[in-house]
Amino acid sequence: MRIGVLAMQGAFREHIQSLEALGVQGVEIRHANQLEGIAGLIIPGGESTTIGKLMVEFNLLEPVRHLAEGGLPVFGTCAGMVLLARDIIGSDQPRLGLMNARVQRNAFGRQVDSFEVDLEIPVLGEEPFHAVFIRAPYIEEIEPPAEALATFKDKIVMVRQGNLLATAFHPELTKDLRVHSYFLKMIG
């Protein structure tokens, strides 16, 4: 199984390392022709406005949207969550707009306000997940069929909608592989 990782910006190498630790091949995606044959796609963190513009410039936005609408599992972390959201508060930036979610960018503050916290994520089991938040967004509101999987201070920080998964935090920056494993189970 090959999982694509959008390699425009952010911790794409760390996502690939997490996939490889689970015995799955992760491949860097920079052009639309590289999407062929992947079983899923990860959109890493970074700066969502920049990633969105690069996806337009490199002709990736529409092909990724088309594949996801056709059922390709897509997992967005931090900026990837912003790009998956239908609504981004105060922004008209390019986005995939696939998830019934309204997102606030950089909601927990600036880079200096980054933090780590143990989250209760029932779909991952009883043990808390140590989450790393860096200039993180949160989801202010969702509509069905989107479903909240984790919250922090009453803000949604992990959500699933069918073949789409998104986290406000960076699971690739920890040794805990449960979020990546959950995504792989979504793929089947």
Swiss-Prot record:
GO MF, one annotated term: pyridoxal 5'-phosphate synthase (glutamine hydrolysing) activity
Enzyme active site: 78, 170, 172
Family annotation (InterPro entries): Class_I_gatase-like (IPR029062), PdxT/SNO (IPR002161), PdxT/SNO_CS (IPR021196)
Short name of one Pfam family: SNO
Keyword set, alphabetical order: Glutamine amidotransferase, Hydrolase, Lyase, Pyridoxal phosphate
Pathway this chain belongs to: Cofactor biosynthesis; pyridoxal 5'-phosphate biosynthesis
EC numbers, comma separated: 4.3.3.6, 3.5.1.2
Cellular component terms (Gene Ontology): cytosol; glutaminase complex
Catalysed reaction equations from the record: aldehydo-D-ribose 5-phosphate + D-glyceraldehyde 3-phosphate + L-glutamine = pyridoxal 5'-phosphate + L-glutamate + phosphate + 3 H2O + H(+); L-glutamine + H2O = L-glutamate + NH4(+)
GO biological process, one term: pyridoxal phosphate biosynthetic process
Binding site for L-glutamine: 46-48, 105, 134-135
Top-rank taxon, per record: Bacteria
KW Hydrolase (keyword) present: yes
Physiological role: Catalyzes the hydrolysis of glutamine to glutamate and ammonia as part of the biosynthesis of pyridoxal 5'-phosphate. The resulting ammonia molecule is channeled to the active site of PdxS.
Subunit structure: In the presence of PdxS, forms a dodecamer of heterodimers. Only shows activity in the heterodimer.
Family recorded in the similarity comment: Belongs to the glutaminase PdxT/SNO family.
Protein name according to UniProt: Pyridoxal 5'-phosphate synthase subunit PdxT
Organism encoding this protein: Moorella thermoacetica (strain ATCC 39073 / JCM 9320)
Gene: pdxT
